[in-house]
Regions:
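A short beta-loop-beta micro-motif enriched in histidine and acidic residues
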Residues: 75, 98-111, 159-160, 166, ...
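Non-heme Fe(II)/2-oxoglutarate
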Residues: 3, 36, 171, 178-201
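Double-stranded beta-helix
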Residues: 123-183
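Conserved hydrophobic/aromatic beta-strand scaffold that supports enzyme active sites
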Residues: 14-16, 113-117, 161-163, 171-173, ...
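Short, structured patches in soluble enzyme cores that scaffold and shape functional sites
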Residues: 83, 99, 116-120, 132, ...
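Non-heme Fe(II)-dependent double-stranded beta-helix
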Residues: 1-97, 102-106
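Short, conserved beta-strand element in jelly-roll/cupin
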Residues: 105-123, 197-200
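Short, charged/polar surface micro-motifs in flexible loops or helix N-caps
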Residues: 88-92, 120-124, 136, 171, ...
Length: 201
């Protein structure tokens, strides 16, 4: 375990690290293409699909690849759920400033995602933007039906975010309570990432 990564994670709420090699990227890109014959519209997390068989296939296949890829990176953890997140071109793919849903008791643990693009993220295709250290601002409880406490300050908060540009297969490992957003994808291609939630074993 890289203690330097752990220290930066606790301070900033995120770290970046290599995750997938070319073989894994080809397998994941192929999986996405097979399951998505039609172009996705807007912002599409596979988690929100109403098709349980589709969700199960995505979860199983991504986790199988990611479990091998995280050996030596994570210690005593278990991958719980995996998904694709697709950001299509255009303004309807913008994801506003937010924090992810609360999935663990954050008074004792950190809920953590491994977010990894299948192609490089840039200023043109909606790279993830964060406020380092914002996971330590205020303890919050978050859910899909709970209004975010920062909703009235979105424009001010967005101005304080910084982009995190990643290579294909390079992961951003982040605390689910960190403030983040992703701007418009101005390219002609859908930007696809894998997102994996994990906990202590």
């Amino acid at each position: 375990v890289d203690l330097g990564l752990q220290e930066r994670f606790e301070r900033d709420g995120y770290v970046t690290a290599p995750l997938y090699g070319q073989q894994e990227l080809r397998a994941l890109s192929g999986l996405y293409s097979r399951l998505h014959r039609d172009p996705q519209q807007e912002f599409f997390p596979s988690t929100y699909s109403g098709n349980p068989e589709y969700r199960s296939i995505v979860d199983r296949e991504i986790r199988a690849i990611t479990e091998t890829a995280t050996e030596g990176l994570l210690y005593s953890t278990q991958l719980r759920y995996a998904s694709f997140i697709a950001k299509s071109p255009g303004p309807r793919g913008v994801v506003n400033v937010h924090q992810d849903m609360t999935l663990v008791d954050e008074s004792a643990f950190s809920g953590i995602n491994i977010w990894c693009p299948l192609e490089p993220t840039t200023q043109n295709n909606g790279a993830l933007q964060v406020i380092p250290g914002s996971h330590r601002w205020i303890e919050t409880y978050r859910g899909s039906t709970i209004r975010g406490i920062y909703d009235n300050l979105r424009s001010q908060i967005q101005a304080r975010t910084m982009p995190v540009y990643l290579a294909a297969g390079e992961a951003m490992i982040f605390d689910q309570s960190i403030i983040h957003y992703s701007p418009q994808n101005f390219t002609a291609r859908t930007r696809v990432v894998t997102n994996v939630f994990f906990t202590r074993r």
